[in-house]
Amino acid sequence: MMQDVSSSPVSPADDSLSNSEEEPDRQQPPSGKRGGRKRRSSRRSAGGGAGPGGAAGGVGGGDEPGSPAQGKRGKKSAGCGGGAGGGGSSSGGGSPQSYEELQTQRVMANVRERQRTQSLNEAFAALRKIIPTLPSDKLSKIQTLKLAARYIDFLYQVLQSDELDSKMASCSYVAHERLSYAFSVWRMEGAWSMSASH
């Protein structure tokens, strides 16, 4: 009789233990067998140190038997935000430095571009002062360059011709005025209109 009594309390305890062991197994199917694999990998990573198993173990550790929905959320967050966070931690804070370096490079490139365009505009303004222009001229940069090339050609032709003598060359102001007038007349005759149309 004592054996029966002693065996009867043990058997319910064994049943309760077996039930308690079976209950997590029944509750784990929503998370699947992956949770068990991740737990095994987490044990391996805990014994072996850091590695890819450690990241999987961290996700597996979040899968509690009573909260399968939290496990799915943990997987989503690990897949989306965890990847970016892992990249930042693996680079050791290198990504903010690279972003700052990119920003400084962009700022320096913008400064250089502004300086280049400013110096280019100043050079074109000086060139427009030298080239005789008509009051109706609103020249673009390419038209200014074409007009400068025409003016150089015109000056070369004037120097080669015998129309201007040394008296005109003695006074630069008069020579410049006459050259400007002659160049304007030369432009009005159609020599510039053909090149400006292109």
Curated annotation (Swiss-Prot):
Its main location: nucleus. CDD domains: bHLH_TS_TWIST1. This is Twist-related protein 1. Residues 34-43 have a biased composition (Basic residues). It comes from Eulemur fulvus fulvus (Brown lemur). GO terms for biological process: cell differentiation; muscle organ development; negative regulation of DNA-templated transcription; rhythmic process. Efficient DNA binding requires dimerization with another bHLH protein. Homodimer or heterodimer with E proteins such as TCF3. ID1 binds preferentially to TCF3 but does not interact efficiently with TWIST1 so ID1 levels control the amount of TCF3 available to dimerize with TWIST and thus determine the type of dimer formed. Residues 157-187 are annotated as: Sufficient for transactivation activity. Residues 46-64, 79-95 have a biased composition (Gly residues). It is found in: Nucleus. The keyword Nucleotide-binding does not apply. GO terms for cellular component: nucleus. GO terms for molecular function: DNA-binding transcription factor activity, RNA polymerase II-specific; protein dimerization activity; RNA polymerase II transcription regulatory region sequence-specific DNA binding. Residues 104-155 form the bHLH domain. Residues 1-18 have a biased composition (Low complexity). PROSITE patterns: BHLH. Acts as a transcriptional regulator. Inhibits myogenesis by sequestrating E proteins, inhibiting trans-activation by MEF2, and inhibiting DNA-binding by MYOD1 through physical interaction. This interaction probably involves the basic domains of both proteins. Also represses expression of pro-inflammatory cytokines such as TNFA and IL1B. Regulates cranial suture patterning and fusion. Activates transcription as a heterodimer with E proteins. Regulates gene expression differentially, depending on dimer composition. SMART domains: HLH.
